[in-house]
Amino acid sequence: MILHPSLASANPLHYGRELTALDNLDFGSLHLDIEDSSFINNITFGMKTVQAVARQTPHPLSFHFMLARPQRWFNALAEIRPAWIFVHAETLDYPSETLTEIRHTGARAGLVFNPATPIDAWRYLASELDGVMVMTSEPDGQGQRFIPSMCEKIQKVRTAFPQTECWADGGITLAAAQQLAAAGAQHMVIGRALFSSSDYRATLAQFATL
């Protein structure tokens, strides 16, 4: 299992300290949720903060854009060489064009689906996608509890997009991770389960063995 710690779940007063604590740990990428309240009711990181994080961390960066116009960020992001950029299917008028713009940054391109969004209408993009991310909780600020039925959606993604890498994000505890791994998830974004633990290395090791 490839893990991606989500910095938005860390204590915002201690981001520098948290980055240092992650420096020597083994995981796929440091995950940054970019939110500006245009798509969900929250604000996370601006470009100055993203650039500061990129300067400090030795890890690759993955980005999850939870905003209405992610394309405005791509030129600036290209300078920090992102590993992955995910955008929400629900926000895109011309998804193929957006995926091409993502690749121009040097990043791998992915689509994100909220729990209520069906995936079938997007199968025509299979050859253009590197990854598909399933939101396994509602990104609504109401507790973001894991939705067990999203395991079925993970299975559908593995069938509909067999050449892409399957990600899960949202409310992932160790118990939820076991279910998601059994369903076929290859990558997991972990937030509170990691940053609320007392031993980051041990917590990552527990998840990684799934």
UniProtKB/Swiss-Prot annotation:
Name of the protein in question = Protein SgcE
Give the pathway listed in the UniProt entry for this protein: Carbohydrate degradation
Query: Which residues are noted in the entry as a divalent metal cation-binding?
Result: 31, 33, 64, 169
Co-factor note (free text)? Binds 1 divalent metal cation per subunit. Active with Co(2+), Fe(2+), Mn(2+) and Zn(2+).
Q: Name one GO molecular function term.
A: metal ion binding
Listed under GO cellular component are:
cytosol
Enzyme nomenclature, EC number = 5.1.3.-
Q: Where does substrate bind?
A: 6, 64, 140-143, 169-171, 191-192
Q: Which CDD domains match?
A: RPE
Q: What class of enzyme is it?
A: isomerase
The free-text function statement in the UniProt record for this protein reads:
Probable pentose-5-phosphate 3-epimerase.
Q: Does the keyword NAD apply?
A: no
Manganese found in the keyword field: yes
Q: Where along the sequence do coiled-coil regions lie?
A: none
Describe the family membership recorded for this protein in Swiss-Prot or TrEMBL. Answer: Belongs to the ribulose-phosphate 3-epimerase family.
Classification of source organism: Bacteria, Pseudomonadati, Pseudomonadota, Gammaproteobacteria, Enterobacterales
Required cofactor(s)? Co(2+); Fe(2+); Mn(2+); Zn(2+)
One annotated GO biological process: pentose-phosphate shunt, non-oxidative branch
Q: Which organism is it from?
A: Escherichia coli (strain K12)
